[in-house]
Amino acid sequence: MLDQISLEIPKGTIYGLVGHSGAGKSTLLRTINGLEGFDEGELWVDGVDLQSLQGDALRVFRKNIGMIFQHFSLMARQNVFENVALPLRCWKYPEAEIQKRVFNLLSLVGLESKSDSYPSALSGGQKQRVAIARALTLEPQILLSDEATSALDPSMTQSILDLLQTINQELGVTVVLVTHEMEVVKKLCHHAAFLEGGKLLRSGNIEELFLQPDPKMRHFLGESEVLPKEGVNIRLYFPKEVAQNPIITQMARQLSLDFSIVWGKLERFGEDVLGSLVINIPEARQEEAERFLESSGVRWEVL
């Protein structure tokens, strides 16, 4: 059951719904296309109040939202072409339009040579590519992904993530994905919402969520810290705007300040490699160190 969920998904982004099993991720995802209802509150999708839709209006609304699942849901007795063409046939598109769209989508997902193959002859990654092509046939503006990579091996997972990124960048499709894999979120998503027990733990920009986690997020991510008891411990965060600047060495030289490095980490977020660092300085030098950090553009906090 979901409770007190309030978030906004920016158009044209890749947005992650993240949490452990039973957190409510898939339930929240399915409210976006009306597969799951809700008792209180409101949900607006692309300017439409979902609660106001029913019958044919809801059916037409769902044309604008594609969806892919963990287990592909392909028809075993139909070849790849017919699996992708299914939504178009249901909506009675002309045959010429069906041919054009299906072959364009098979080219997009890298399966143009597999149009006559049947699902039993495909790998797991290829089956998911067919499912993605099928989800895009009606040219949706939103693509929902419910644990679409969790049944795949690491190499297949990466290929599907690359494909979702291509779809987002080239077609401008908003991708909302459910996952429990933190590496997927870091590599692919622009924003994310973390759920726990049906409640929203935190949401926002990926860099801020992972590089500057609050105590609840640190507990969720399983991070623990062992810090020196003497001196002052300061955590520094290096967003991409200042990630290449030699801030630490500049501080040491300009302030003639000796400090020790407690720990640090580097992580890849999309195309950027960003990090955080914890340093320990003498308590007597805290004030001047803080003044320097304030002017440096780096984010920081005293632990």
Swiss-Prot record:
SMART domains: AAA, NIL
Catalytic activity: L-methionine(out) + ATP + H2O = L-methionine(in) + ADP + phosphate + H(+); D-methionine(out) + ATP + H2O = D-methionine(in) + ADP + phosphate + H(+)
Residue ranges of the TM segments: none
UniProt KW Hydrolase keyword: no
Locations listed in the record: Cell inner membrane
Enzyme Commission number(s) of this protein: 7.4.2.11
Keyword Cell membrane among record annotations: yes
Record key words, sorted: Amino-acid transport, ATP-binding, Cell inner membrane, Cell membrane, Membrane, Nucleotide-binding, Translocase, Transport
Membrane topology classification: Peripheral membrane protein
Pfam families: ABC_tran, NIL
GO molecular function term, any single one: ATP binding
Annotated InterPro entries: AAA+_ATPase, ABC_transporter-like_ATP-bd, ABC_transporter-like_CS, ACT-like_dom_sf, MetN_ABC_transporter-like, NIL_domain, P-loop_NTPase
Main localization, broad class: membrane
GO cellular component: plasma membrane
Binding site for ATP: 19-26
Boundaries of every ABC transporter domain copy: 1-222
Entry function: Part of the ABC transporter complex MetNIQ involved in methionine import. Responsible for energy coupling to the transport system.
Quaternary structure annotation from Swiss-Prot or TrEMBL: The complex is composed of two ATP-binding proteins (MetN), two transmembrane proteins (MetI) and a solute-binding protein (MetQ).
Assigned protein family: Belongs to the ABC transporter superfamily. Methionine importer (TC 3.A.1.24) family.
Protein known as: Methionine import ATP-binding protein MetN
Gene: metN
